[in-house]
Amino acid sequence: EVDAGYASNYTCRGIVASHALAEGDSVIPAGVNLNYKLCDANSIVASASYTTLTSGHHLMGDRDISFHNETNFNLGWQNKDGLLKNLSTTLGWNLIHGGLLGNFAKYDHAHSVTQEFYLNLNYDLTQNWFAGVTTSYAFQGMTGWWFQPYVGYKAALCPVTDIVVTAGMSATSSYFGAAFEQANGAQAWWVKAELPVKLGVKNLSLVPFVSFNWAGCGALKVNKGLDKGDKPYKNFGVVAGASLVYSF
């Protein structure tokens, strides 16, 4: 699967960056997702993505600290129905260069790379409802834990159009450095709606989306006490955009 698109704001695990954080707002993401079947139950999954920030590329306007575009590499093993019927389990490794997490790593550790191991559990509750959680442990750059539980609903509106609605949150434990205000607690809450539309070309879809994002207590601690123009995160943000997806 190959995709490319546009989003009105840069987001990281539900956190919406302010204009001040990266000297800009919108992003242009592109990526490729691969799934190699080993057998009916097991697969090797891999992905690579690059997110271009249409911004000044400086962290909080500091000319000495660049805010790099985000590059993400992912490699994992996926099992379906092995532990429990309707349960998909993915265990893998993730490398992030740039973006919010990579740039925080550079700020504290003189480089822009964060690496982590992750475990995703996704359970199909019914034909339409699903729920899951992704747990990540970062071991290079920024270290600590991320937790991202979610619940969602998917259905066909007509033969060429589906709808997917997801609600979720992200939280950290001892991340960003134990002494940092944002180290622990909820970082973001969100509700996202997607409307995949099959186009006339075989395997080609357009996926418009909109999400409503609220900063969690961890992110709010960073904003607290700062002037409005200097807050790194949006207390509330609406992010809209679309992606063109080709499946093969």
Regions found by a protein language model. Name each.
Residues 1-39, 43-60:
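Short glycine/proline- and aromatic-enriched beta-strand/turn motifs that initiate or cap beta-hairpins
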Residues 2, 39-46, 82-89, 127-133, ...:
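Repeated loop/turn-to-beta-strand initiation elements of outer-membrane beta-barrel proteins
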Residues 2-8, 46-52, 77, 91-97, ...:
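Transmembrane beta-barrel strands of outer-membrane/channel proteins
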Residues 12-20, 56-66, 100-112, 134-135, ...:
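Outer-membrane beta-barrel translocator domains and adjoining extracellular loop/strand segments
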Residues 22-30, 67-71, 111-117, 143-147, ...:
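Residues that define the transmembrane beta-barrel architecture of outer-membrane proteins
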Residues 30-32, 46, 73-75, 117-119, ...:
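Membrane-embedded beta-strands of outer-membrane beta-barrel proteins
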Residues 72-124:
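Hydrophobic alpha-helical segments and helix pairs
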Residues 199, 234-248:
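Outer-membrane beta-barrel "beta-signal"
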